[in-house]
């Protein structure tokens, strides 16, 4: 005899994750779910990724994967799906992302302080914490999306190109850091 237990709340969360994951594929719908400043930061990340990779499809995939991950994480968080240990990991993840954001801006604002290894290490620490937070909740495909995003942004060559003061991405970095700084000021990261 099957012991399947129907739980409407779990079903609703699964549906939300699925629907919002699909909706994140549409730029129009994704921007309606994300505030203006975050949208501007995501647009800059897309632009610099597209120019760096010289591949529109890869840049779109990385950006979509980032948006889908953020939306699914928000759905889980808002629906109280995390146990006590995961809540602790989530808080640690949020602090690490805040530290990363402050470091990104600091490296831009203070000349000769940029260290690609420091940024790459922080990004990889965020990745590991995120995997731990979502381990029980999201599929292997979602974990692959996380890796796709972090593999790109933690790449030391990408970071060096982005922060090169004489490189082609200087304006992108400026707009990116202005947006991240605004998110920090608004306590949004």
From Swiss-Prot:
Transmembrane segments: none annotated. It is found in: Cytoplasm. One of its GO terms (molecular function) is cysteine-type endopeptidase inhibitor activity involved in apoptotic process. GO terms for biological process: apoptotic process; positive regulation of apoptotic process. InterPro entries: TNFAIP8-like, TNFAIP8_sf. Gene3D superfamilies: Tumor necrosis factor alpha-induced protein 8-like. Pfam families: DUF758. Keywords: Apoptosis, Cytoplasm. The keyword Ubl conjugation does not apply. GO terms for cellular component: cytoplasm. The keyword Ribonucleoprotein does not apply. Acts as a negative mediator of apoptosis. Belongs to the TNFAIP8 family. This is Tumor necrosis factor alpha-induced protein 8. It comes from Xenopus laevis (African clawed frog). The lineage of its organism: Eukaryota, Metazoa, Chordata, Craniata, Vertebrata.
